[in-house]
Amino acid sequence: MNVILLDKVANLGSLGDQVSVKAGYARNFLLPYGKAVVANAANTEVFEARRAELEAKLAAELATATARADKLTALEAVVIASKAGDEGKLFGSIGNRDIADAVTAAGVALAKSEVRLPLGALRTTGSFEIEVQVHAEVKAVVKIAIVAEA
């Protein structure tokens, strides 16, 4: 099934690309989520008329994501207090939700799905640099300091 993409789709293409995908992928994901339209003559004309509007929308999303990334990078180390043993090993761990909540409390909104912990949850005290993906093309680094509760 041929479709015209209305948004950037990972491993498929970007705005305006005409791609061939399996019918089930188009019917169950691309079309219901508004990421594509069926490639026929009528939809092609409508898309070409809306192309500038869609490109402006994508550019605006990228600009807001870049602004958020700058705010996140400008943050000083976000301190998270957690119970820990004598050697700095935490009782429990600090995960995506804990980091997102701490950064949001520091003043910049952050969703837990944007936090990237490739090595898993943090289990020791200390300072860490956490990668945050605010947009498909924009990443930021947030400094986290985990300290033992008194």
UniProtKB/Swiss-Prot annotation:
Keywords associated with the record: Ribonucleoprotein, Ribosomal protein, RNA-binding, rRNA-binding
Domain of life the protein comes from: Bacteria
Molecular function per GO: rRNA binding; structural constituent of ribosome
GO biological process terms held by the UniProt record: translation
Keyword rRNA-binding in record: yes
Gene3D superfamilies linked to this entry: Ribosomal protein L9, C-terminal domain, Ribosomal protein L9, N-terminal domain
GO cellular component, one term: ribosome
InterPro entries per UniProt: Ribosomal_bL9, Ribosomal_bL9/RNase_H1_N, Ribosomal_bL9_bac/chp, Ribosomal_bL9_C, Ribosomal_bL9_C_sf, Ribosomal_bL9_N, Ribosomal_bL9_N_sf
Recorded family membership: Belongs to the bacterial ribosomal protein bL9 family.
NCBIfam families: L9
Entry function: Binds to the 23S rRNA.
Identification of the protein by name: Large ribosomal subunit protein bL9
Provenance organism: Shewanella frigidimarina (strain NCIMB 400)
Gene that this sequence comes from: rplI
